[in-house]
Structures are given as C-alpha cells and as structure tokens.
Regions:
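Non-catalytic cap/lid and distal C-terminal segments of serine-dependent acyl enzymes
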Residues: 1-170
Length: 170
C-alpha cells in the first residue's frame, strides 16, 4: 500500500489544496487492475484531509481490498459553493475527481466509486452523492447533521456559506 500526500493548485478554488491518498499495492502485480475502485472520504467540521489517517485505522481497514481512498480538505465549507467564499461543492464533486484521475488510474465507473464522510463530511457526501447518483454506487453518512437550524452562530455561519436568500422547502 502506498500513502501519498499530494498538493496541487485548484482552479475552482483559486488556491493550493492538499489531500491524502491511499493506493493499494497488488498482491499479485500480474493480476493488477487497470483502474482502481475509489472511496472519496470527506472530513468533518474543524478538520482536514489528515484526520482520517491520524485519527482512524482507515489504512488497516482498506488493506487487501484493492480500494483507493482519496481524503481531500474542504475547510469548514459544508461542501457547498459558498455565497461569500470558495466553491467547495464544485471542487469536491467535479475538479477533484478529474485531477485525481489525471494522477492515478482511478475508475470512472459508477459501480467503482463510493463517497462517505463524517459529520459535516457525511452531510457533504449525502449532498454530493444524491446530486450525482450516476457517479456513486454508495453513499456513507457517519454522524451527519444535515440541517442548519439553530442558534445565532449557526444562522451566521449559514448566512456566510449559503447567502441571505432563503431556499424554498428548507
């Protein structure tokens, strides 16, 4: 298994971004797959790309599965194209998969792609997975809180992220 920390310039965000990648090492190289199945693993609020490697056993969990794991950073964006900030939904759902596939032999087939996240990342995985059902075979939401109702701080963060225009049906 290879563990790679990769940085590149995101055109969508207009800044340098970082993510961790776990690449499987084939037990029998002569039987290696041409394209790897991939898990897009999203961090929670106040976290970053390194949380999964530093605070979980993700590397042990995916050992011998042949699964690539991509763990990007999305700041505290709620995986949304912010009204007053970065376009993190577009970055995570479109640019990141394209860039990772240009670096590594990752499958584009729906049945080989999975998206999962914790807390804010779980809500982001749910949002991205449901908005792009033709891209993901499964969605994992771990402790996701998808509503933004609450106190003044929650309303202020919601306004900064989503803008002041209310959305119908929310």
């Amino acid at each position: 298994m290879a563990f790679i920390n990769i940085g590149f310039f995101s055109k969508t965000l207009g800044m340098e971004v970082t993510c961790d990648v776990i690449l499987p090492q084939p037990v029998h190289p002569e039987n290696a797959q041409d394209e790897l199945p991939v898990l897009w693993l999203l961090h929670g609020a106040y976290g970053n790309y390194a949380d999964w490697m530093r605070r979980t056993s993700i590397e042990r969990y995916v050992a011998n599965t042949g699964l690539c794991v991509v763990m990007p950073s999305a700041q505290n964006s709620d995986y949304t194209d912010m009204a007053h900030g970065g376009r993190f939904y577009t970055y995570i759902s479109s640019e990141l998969p394209e860039r990772m596939r240009s670096f590594f032999p990752l499958s584009q087939r729906r049945e080989d792609n999975y998206i999962c996240g914790l807390s804010m990342g779980g809500a982001g995985a749910f949002k991205i997975g449901l908005s792009k059902p033709d891209h993901y075979a499964a969605i994992g939401c771990l402790s996701a809180g998808a509503q933004n109702k609450g106190g003044r701080l929650i309303r202020m963060m919601g306004s900064l992220i989503y803008g002041d225009t209310p959305c119908e049906g929310t």
